[in-house]
Amino acid sequence: LGGGWGVLASDSCEKHGLVVPSLPQEALDKISRVLPSYWSKGNPVDTVAKFDAATLRTCMETLLELPSIDSVIIAGFGTYSYFADEIPKSPFASKEQTQPFKLVKEVEEEIAKNIAESRIKYEKPILVVTRLTGDESSSVKILKTTGVLPFSTSQRAAKALSKLVQRMRSRESRREAKN
């Protein structure tokens, strides 16, 4: 979701032998239509804290549609719904102060549903990095109940993805050997 998260994820992928490909101009143009002009215009895609479900879905699906993209890591997800639930518990929070958090929670939950739907639609792994991997975040709960496992660090997500790639290559090699 933000630049620092993306750089960490990209570096972790490369460390684990995964390729983070450049994006074709057509994909960059499509993403540029929904992000502010100052976004990084590259991979990793930095959504510059633009937080609405339609924008994030467009970015995610633009990547998933590309034959050169085998998976997507979404980093920096899940904390809004947690804070939306926790802040109202504070004796210092007024109803007016908590209302924006409820709206953001709804957006984040919609994003979680979009991630789950896109994983099925495109049949590509989508890994999510979040500080909250338990059940303390309603959006992370949505992911977990739909088969999207959260990772606590970009390094863990990249390592898991690397192992998945190794497993797929091993299966392909065995299939080819049989033929």
Specify the residue positions occupied by each region the protein language model found:
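Short glycine-cluster motifs
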Residues: 1-100
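Peripheral docking tails and interdomain loops at the edges
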Residues: 1-20, 85-179
